[in-house]
């Protein structure tokens, strides 16, 4: 134990090295408790050397033995109790008893030899040889544990060969042994390496196992509490604990926590141990019963009958008392047989292990050579890549610098790690015992990149597993006994030395290959930064963390190692990483081993504890190697101590971090330019390894750990954002982009730019323009002829689509419903007649922005350009004012002229006959356009008529100006019902003028002759019609009068009206000139007209002309365009307002209701309070009255009382 690093005396259950050596140094889980417990357990504790001296050591030793046994066993009988006595807990336990063969366990245990052991640190190194496993059962184990130091000595002496054999196998610390699977792995989960005796976790040493650590294995191995019959030998043999063993395991004091009161557990029944369950039972409180190996226990269990060899006479007596001699003998015989079998098995296993180790070593060397060749090739590739990358990097260096601080730290750490791993890796391999190390290396070789990885990982494991490593390294843990420890140590060290030599050689090669590999990987990673594999690798890595994670190669060989007991020993920390349970995918590891490894290193640095999934990969890599390195741990540890110290202030990283955590601490120093490290790495082996490691880490971290998936990802991880990965070459984080991402981005760009994007690679830029041009062409073409075929409509109906016409009808229906609901006056049918022809939107157009606000909006110019698409123009403030003035004039005129307008219009108008419906629409002409039109029409109309009319109008110049235009406009509108509707909306806008306009159109008689009846009918009809039609729109229009939107709408309307007028005006013979009206400068015509009109209208005309010109420039009619949009919008707004009103009224009603209800509630609560207070008053009053009553009663009752007394007194008299 001394040799082993006790540093972490904490039980390094997880620390068993996977090294072929089953030998593991284990610190007793609860050394002092063990000692105390053992001693308390009874003098036997002291008597059993191990118990006393190795109390901690013993439980620990027991655990170690167990582990060793298991490690050995795994091959033969991973956990089969029979195959390896160790494997069956009972057997293991009994092994101490049975071990007696080798040495009288009892006596030996009892002898103070055990005491000598105590001197050794609690940690016990158990070198499980195959025999050792047997020894567990066999004396070697027992002496180490149960037998006690003397037995241990004897065993050491007697079993030195065993010890040595075991030495080959990992010596398993008792605590490890105690935990069936120190890693908390279920026995099944741990695939035991045939090389290593499986740690027979099943047969965990109870003492070794913290009382609470009862694993399934224990339970499984231990029979449930059986009746004495059940517990009989039949079960015992599997249990592997004969009474003696049981006694060894369960000292009475051990049993004290829960003596086997249960009949099943009676020591009487050899099977009370029933797989010696109790030892594992948490029964012994950790303090009370330090887990002790049965051998360590060597306390007599009162209930257990020790085999004669094992037990003192007293023990024997105790046992015999409780156990039938028959069962004890049976147990003993079984144990003996088992032990014999175990010993043989262990020997075979040891031989196998040795053979395997040799094989592995050779394999590793071969692999390493292959790896080196591969690395050299990769190096060449990497050089090319690097040059390429450097160019890119130079470009991105600036960006990288920004990111560097974050990423580089981890990188530097990684470098540090790498350096360590380089130094230590060779040792780790050696430590690992060539077998394991070689295996690792072989695996590494198998996986080109992985080889280096193990090297990197090893250092980390060293840091992480210092104590374990020390224990491993010292496999000669004094725990077993000085001799055994020495033998084991010698064996281990010889193996280590060989392994080290081998490793040093390999490591040099590996370092070089790693440097090249690292470079290549950097390049690859750079190329594959987006590779999703990395995260997977990270996940896989965690599993491989134990051994495989070190490299892909490791990954390939790792699973076995992982399953082998030792890696799991270290694995417990890996358990930190969640992933360890998952099976890592060697394939993925191989591909992304570097990346993963990098990720792991990073993870380690960044988030040792968090590492978990990502760290699994990173840490495990390092960890695994380290674990393997544990055999050479001493050296590596020493070496590491320095490097670790350099890199990681806390050489013993928190267990959670394990190797990984080690790394983070280890490499606090800034990553430093990763590239620089890389360059240095070429120069220095350490440098090389470190860069590869750091790169691996950075890459891995970036690709793997950075990935969000990796829990390990630490904030520190370079890629806090999983989307970002560290680009080694660029030395900066760059966004991780997958092909899918690129595809999506391209598609989105194509969408935005309006070209078609196909995933087809044949698609190239040249096509883009064509496609765009085609799309533009399609978009700009006039719309196709309306196709209302039933097929198409049915198809569209599937999507809830229909034709505009049907939509209009539906909208009209809705409007009717709304009107009915709101009792609005029904608008004139023509409004709905043509699709959206009503220019109502014009009036409806409203906005909460003031024109000035809109004029000052940032994208004002863009908006103006947009309007030009629709032949609309922006109206400047002056124009708007003019228009507003015009509108006001029109309104005034309308009001003034309403009366005169009829006659004026009748007499002055020679307009084409207008159908009644047309007149209805005509009012719109009044719009500003009409004013323009008015001058034109006035000038055009025969001067006589005009003059007369003008004169009439002069008094009302405004009227007159407007009127002439209205007539023409009206006529035009009348002729064009649709146009009329549009104008109508305008008219509504200029509603004031509309009334007189209406009369005019109505009054127009055919050929300009006014038919007396027509004016009346037409006027009345039109008037009413317009009134109703315009009523709703008027309000909106008036609201919007000031708005530029309205003005623009007006303009467009004017244009429309002008166009409309053209026909009617042309129709009216008197107004031949009106055709000029065609939305062309009507104002000019107006100017020709009477000067008065001209003057009045000049300003109006100017503004109107401008707006008209702008509005009329394009054939607005073709696409209802903005007007239709405005109209739809208007409808939408109106509906919204309606809805809002309904809801508001509802809301108000509800509020009122709520208020009244709340008032009522308040009143009620008040009345309730009053009632309550009254009730209280009543109660108190009642109580008061009652009290008075009682008082009165008492007063009245006293005499009553006396009466009877007196009565009685007197009665006898």
Curated annotation (Swiss-Prot):
Claim: Plastid is one of the keywords in the record: no
UniProt modified residues of type Phosphothreonine: 433, 905
Keywords: Acetylation, Coiled coil, Methylation, Phosphoprotein
Compositional bias ranges of the Acidic residues kind: 1095-1112
Phosphoserine modified-residue sites: 10, 84, 95, 766, 826, 828, 857, 907, 1099
Transmembrane keyword on record: no
Biased composition (Pro residues): 648-657
Superkingdom, natural source: Eukaryota
Polar residues bias (residue ranges): 15-33, 681-700, 847-858, 1065-1081
Positions bearing Asymmetric dimethylarginine: 305
Comp. bias regions, Low complexity: 51-63, 76-89, 103-114
Coiled-coil residue spans: 319-402, 1093-1197
Cross-referenced Pfam families: DUF3736
Biased composition (Basic and acidic residues): 331-384, 537-560, 630-643
GO BP terms in the entry: gene expression; in utero embryonic development; placenta development
N6-acetyllysine sites (modified residues): 496, 739
Family annotation (InterPro entries): GSE-like, GSE1
Annotated segments matching region Disordered: 1-154, 326-384, 527-579, 630-719, 816-858, 898-979, 1065-1118
Assembly and interaction partners: May be a component of a BHC histone deacetylase complex that contains HDAC1, HDAC2, HMG20B/BRAF35, KDM1A, RCOR1/CoREST, PHF21A/BHC80, ZMYM2, ZNF217, ZMYM3, GSE1 and GTF2I.
Protein name: Genetic suppressor element 1
Organism per entry: Mus musculus (Mouse)
Name of the gene this protein is made from: Gse1
